[in-house]
Amino acid sequence: MSLDRKYAIASRIVREIRRDRRSIAMIIGAPVIVMSLIGFSFQTQKSVLNEAAPALIATMVMFFVFVLTAVSFLRERSQGTLERLLSTAVSRGDLLVGYLTGFLIFALIQSLIILMYTLFVINVDYAGKLWDIIFILLIVTITSVNMGIFVSTFARNEFQII
């Protein structure tokens, strides 16, 4: 497995997502809007929000990361990029690690946006260490990226993913 090939694939994914305004809106805008609505809905019931916050954060991270990864990977397949890469000398392992790394960069950014917005803008109280929360969120994020790639291999269009 070549580190250069993995890096090239991951950097191409990063460039593609950075150029796509819809993906950037999905990474930043959608989670902030949804978490704002949730925070506003529980504005008078702070204790309920504090109890539900861990599940909400995990659910939002899982949903948004899954959708971002699955839709982006499906777009790669539908545009023929994946098939062109498979016809080159790139091994399937390099391809998989490159795609995982590329998507994981934006998934981690999105997860941190959701977490920080929930903790510091909505002001959810949390017990424990922030690093413990980030570690659990990292596991959820990696799982969601893998699930997004897995499900997108069976989907024919974006509506089947959502």
Where are these regions (language model features)?
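Transmembrane helix-boundary elements of multi-pass transport/secretion proteins
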Residues: 2-82, 92-112, 116-137, 141, ...
